[in-house]
Amino acid sequence: MTEQATNGAADEQQPQFSLQRIYLRDLSFESPKSPEIFRQEWNPSISLDLNTRQKQLDGDFYEVVLTVSVTVKNGEDTTAFIAEVQQAGIFLIKNLDPSSMSHTLGAFCPNILFPYAREALDNLVVRGSFPALMLSPVNFDALYAQEIARMQASGEIPTPSVQ
């Protein structure tokens, strides 16, 4: 009996991660040069912008929002379309040390959300009568590491010391 109680207490202290919900927070599409753009030869250039934000809801629940913005120009300066999606998720995250929590919110959760955002963007673009938008996978771990290095270099967060 005591062993079960001890195991139960130990289980409560184990790191926990659970996806609670994935949802579309915001979606927009603009094609400012329609219908003229459809009569032009298609020579696209793509600009992609990624952003994440997170906030603690209540207790151990966190909302992570991944914003993916795409601007496609035809030729040098004609904007074909602008599309943006805010894909969000609610995650239960417990018993992580601060470094692991930061990495989970900044890289792991966006990795989960990105395929949903990519699908929503592709659907928008096709419905706008443009060729499918095939976004490559994103390495959020590398982006997270770059952001941490940038913050350490600028003094926004201290550089960890080696003991």
From Swiss-Prot:
Keyword Cytoplasm (UniProt): yes
Gene3D superfamilies attached to this UniProt entry: SecB-like
GO CC field: cytoplasm
Protein localization: Cytoplasm
Keywords: Chaperone, Cytoplasm, Protein transport, Translocation, Transport
HAMAP family: SecB
Subunit comment: Homotetramer, a dimer of dimers. One homotetramer interacts with 1 SecA dimer.
The name this protein goes by in its record: Protein-export protein SecB
Native species: Pseudomonas aeruginosa (strain ATCC 15692 / DSM 22644 / CIP 104116 / JCM 14847 / LMG 12228 / 1C / PRS 101 / PAO1)
Name of the gene encoding the protein in the UniProt record: secB
